[in-house]
Each structure stands twice: as C-alpha cells, then as structure tokens.
Amino acid sequence: ILDMKDPTHAALIRPISDAVAALTQKHGGLLWGEHGKGLRSQYVPDYFGDLYPALQELKAAFDPHNQLNPGKIATPKTVPQARLTRVDGVELRGDLDRAIDERVWQSYDTAVHCNGNGACYNFDPDDAMCPSWKGTRNRVHSPKGRASLIREWLRLQGQQDVDVVAASDHLRSTNNATSITKLALNTVAKKMGQQDFSHEVYEAMAGCLACKSCAGQCPVKVNVPEFRSRFLELYHSRYLRPLKDYLIGSLEFTIPYLARVPRLYNFVMGVGPVRFILEHV
C-alpha cells in the first residue's frame, strides 16, 4: 500500500503508472474505466493511436482556446503549445496531509482515512447513513464532508505548530479551563466576524446527530461522533458554548433542589417571560 504522505512512495506514482499502462495496452485493455482518464491523459495518445488527432480536432472545434479542462484527454490543434496533464504533475492529497503530525494522524484515524468513496451520499430513505446529509442535501453535512473539514483543520493546526493531541491531554489532565473572560472575548470576536476556520468546522459538526450510522456503514468506518466530540472539546476551550448547553448541563445539579419547592417551580415555569426565554434559548 502506498502512503502518499511519504515522498518516496509518492515518487513511485509515475513508474507504477507507466508499467501498468504498458501492461494493459499489451493485452488490449484500458488503464481507466468509465471515469478517471482525465488525470491519466498523458497515456491517451498511446491508447488512441491514429485516432488521437481526430480527438484534437474535436477539441479544437468546441474549445479552440483550450479553456475547458485544459490538459485533459486531448489538446486542441489550435493551441500547439498545450500539453496533456502528467500523471505525476498533479497535486496529491498526501502533499497536504504531510503537514499533519504522524501521532495526530494516528489519533484521528477515524477521520483522516476517509478515501472519498461517497457511500454516505445516499438517497435511499431506508438506509440509515446519513440523516443530516439526507435532510440538508449539503455535502458539508455528510460524513465525507465532515471528515474532509477535520483533516483540513488538523493540517492548519499542524502548520501553526499546534499539537491537538497534546492540547486535549493537557485539558483532561489539568482541568485547565480557559477563564470566562477570555472565552467571552473570543466569542465576541467570533460574533464580530473574526476569521477562524474552526467556525466552519463547528457549523458542520453542530448538525451531526451522533447516530453513528457512519461508523457502522461507511466502508472505511469513518466515525463522525468520535472525532466530533474531540473537536468540540478543543473548540469550547476557546469559545463559549450556547446558553442552552449550560442550562441543560446544570439540570442534574439543580433539579433535586427544585423538587423541594414544586409549587414555586411550576409557578415560575408558567410565567410568560420565562416560557418565552426557555422556548427561544
């Protein structure tokens, strides 16, 4: 298995592709199926042979200035300097993933191993995966979308020398909660539009129902609730939680005391302003 984060493995893309292309051509086969010939365009002339100039003429008729998917499948004869895309000339996902420390990579394996197969883009109403995707039809709210956002978030943290694993361990071992003042200031800055990619990740994670259908049905077992909880742990060490979270979190401690004064509690709950606040918080 090739690890595209390893430059020595990435360098094997060209020789392996050349060998496979030669082997399939030798036996009258193709290097691609219904899709996938675009990034393998350098092999198109070898497979089409004498028909390749006809493809170039067709390309020139509809795209004389080589503006539509340049470098893919065929170059127009009207642009003689145009070249086909080289199989080792495109950016690989591993080029970006190298910014993620290996320890962090292993720790967030339920997110980073998403291979983009798209099984979560499921329209079948009887299939459990994924309810938030089915409800929104927004790919950001799919397991694939959330895994991609987390991987990019980890990459950006790595670029700034932030070790998210160490940060999580520190929070748990020291219970070192950020001061309410700092949390409030950060949250105000967020409301005022201060840029932080974490907010985009948060919006995607907030729509997850934590049903774990992805963990059971995704072919590579992407587990959104698992890495979602870890992200939220760090996110809310920097930004305030919604008020409703604090209210619900306090119920376990306040209900035993409220149970001693049921009439007063019921009266307060029936007051118009209180009901309005509870309905809208």
Please state what every model-predicted region is:
Residues 1-115, 139, 145, 167-170, ...:
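Conserved glycine-rich FAD pyrophosphate-binding loop
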Residues 4, 22, 26, 46-50, ...:
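Short, well-ordered loop/turn and helix-capping segments at boundaries between secondary-structure elements
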Residues 7-8, 138, 191-196:
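Short, contiguous acidic/charged loop-to-helix segments that flank catalytic cores in large enzymes
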Residues 19-22, 53, 57, 149-152, ...:
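Alpha-helical scaffold segments in soluble metabolic enzymes
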Residues 21, 55, 65, 120-171, ...:
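Mobile "lid/hinge" segments at catalytic clefts and subdomain interfaces of large enzymes
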Residues 24, 28, 66-67, 122-125, ...:
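Proline-centered turn/helix-capping motifs that create local helix->coil transitions or kinks
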Residues 70-72, 113-149, 207, 211-232:
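Iron-sulfur cluster-binding cysteine motifs and their immediate structural context
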Residues 169-171, 180-281:
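Iron-sulfur-cluster electron-transfer modules
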